[in-house]
Design a protein with these regions (language model features):
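Noncatalytic, solvent-exposed loop/strand surfaces
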Residues: 1-197
Length: 197
């Protein structure tokens, strides 16, 4: 199955034939909006999140005897996790992502994938991107601040905080062999993350 989060909604195609097997409208009534966060696939389930009064939805894929398959909504909530640009990450049944519009100062949130319940919101850290590695959330804010925190549904606990870039750090960063690669509008940096374990 090929999944795509299109401007109009959630599309699933048969990988062999290219034929549509599922579509559900999942978009804002605001025409100027986009669905920018990528689908978060977890086994046979998928989490979608969008801003502009859309929210999040969690679906489960079920294979049919005819090979067509279908997606059944587990839950959909308007105010659970409204990701504007950044794709959320998951760990042990919980998703972590930036909730709210980028220009209005989103908050980092943890939600339960079981029912979309909000577990916590982090103090205002602004917009950014995040990855998950070894039970940690690795966050790079648009202001160039690196935050390493526990990926735990209990609370937001910062383990390390450091200014590594200037403002305008909107590009997604990469992690490889315990090294973080990130850039702002003027430079590229590489940091060893194993020093924060």
């Amino acid at each position: 199955v090929v999944l795509s989060f299109m401007r109009e909604g959630f599309l699933a195609l048969n990988a062999k034939t290219g034929k549509e097997i599922f579509f559900e409208r999942f978009r804002s009534p605001i025409n100027a909006s986009v669905n920018a966060a990528s689908p978060l696939v977890i086994d046979n389930q998928v989490l979608l999140s969008s801003c502009y009064e859309v929210g999040a939805g969690f679906w489960a894929y079920k294979e049919s005897s005819a090979g067509k398959g279908s997606f059944d909504a587990i839950w959909k909530k308007k105010n659970a996790l409204d990701c504007h640009y950044s794709t959320p990450v998951q760990r042990d049944g919980f998703a972590y992502g930036f909730h709210g519009r980028q220009e209005r100062g989103p908050v980092l949130r943890c939600i339960s994938l079981k029912d979309g319940k909000v577990m916590w919101e982090a103090p205002a850290i602004g917009a950014g991107n995040l990855l998950r590695a070894k039970g940690r959330l690795i966050v790079l804010t648009e202001d160039g601040e690196l935050i390493v925190a526990d990926a735990s549904p209990d609370r937001f606990r910062v383990l390390h905080r450091q200014q590594i870039l200037g403002a305008g750090s909107r590009a997604h960063f990469a992690l490889s062999n315990a090294r973080l690669f990130a850039r702002d509008q003027r430079r590229l940096v590489c940091l060893r993350l194993d020093q924060f374990e």
